[in-house]
Amino acid sequence: MKMKNPLEPAGRTALEASRELLALEPEEKALALRLMAAGVRSAAEKIVRENGLDMEEARKGGRNAAFLDRLLLTPERVEHMARGMEQVAALPDPVGECIREWTRPNGLHIRQVRVPLGVIGFIYESRGTVTCDAAALCLKSGNAVILRGGSESLRTNRALAEVLRAALKESAVSADAVQLLDSGSRDEVRQLCGLDSFLNVIIPRGGKGLIRAVTEYARVPVLKHLDGVCHVYVDAAADLEMAVNVLDDAKTQRPGVCNAAETLLVDAAAAERFLPMAAERMRLRGVECRVCDRSRPFFGPEAIPAEEEDWSTEYEDLILSVKVVDGVRDAVEHINHYGSHHSDSIITEDE
């Protein structure tokens, strides 16, 4: 006898909410998003307080600096979340947009039109910001969402979900369009992945372990990426002052996020001019550099010789691997071999 999935009630109400969303006008969804943003802004003090309790437990648990940074919500970050939802509200509504159209030789006219998926399962780890991001983007695109955040951010997510659902009750959108699974049980991930009668797609956001578990358990399509081995390539034709500022931002602003730079590639023709600038900036920022033989002369004795595994490592920390390459083709070959195809950049003035 097949066991009943305990999350079926959540799936059923989310499905009903997704059908109601189909009937809403773009302005009704935009208003709901603005109400959600206002609610988050008004509840900032409570959200930060609940997040502080999560932070305290994470510190006691010995979590590293990158993890704590992902978990942390400051008043400024809460305001950033609210503004983000307002920005999503202001975007053109994607539902009903014609992507392309064509006429067949037999006269049949075909249009490819954007439509909502239905119900999205969003599984993530320690970032409370994802609660608002996922809810806003799903609502804007006409989808209901069932959120399952990490147990480390349980209080934070509860506070955020409470605010978002309260805001929806003041709008034309059903509060069941945004639901949070908050038991903290590890079984919830497997159970959510098994809601194939209600979910249309699952989006996991987190580390390799989470992504692999979701991929293994899921009975619906999964939108995923595994790693964030991201590169900055500085070409010989780059504006070097701009390049060092881009590198600084890409590596040091949020080193624990998945789109932070992990490897710097420098054209050999620019190495003598650029690497001293990069070495000094990274030294000032407290970044540990792991360097290839060709780049080592430009770094001090504190630089560490790079090992083979460094080129494919997502550090999630103030660590940067550095390699000199022979032009853009060599750089692209390196990125294709070692990278994760997440977020890579080429800095050049030569189009």
Q: What residue ranges belong to the model's regions?
A:
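N-terminal Rossmann-like NAD(P)+-binding subdomain of aldehyde/semialdehyde dehydrogenases
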Residues: 1-110
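ALDH superfamily catalytic-core signature
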Residues: 5, 126-144, 159, 163, ...
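A structural signal for short, well-ordered beta-strand elements
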Residues: 22-23, 236, 324, 347
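Flexible, glycine/charged-enriched surface loops at secondary-structure junctions
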Residues: 24-30, 95, 171-178, 254-260, ...
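Rossmann-like NAD(P) dinucleotide-binding subdomain of oxidoreductase/dehydrogenase enzymes
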Residues: 90, 98-237, 241
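Conserved C-terminal structural/oligomerization subdomain of aldehyde/semialdehyde dehydrogenase
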Residues: 117, 307-351
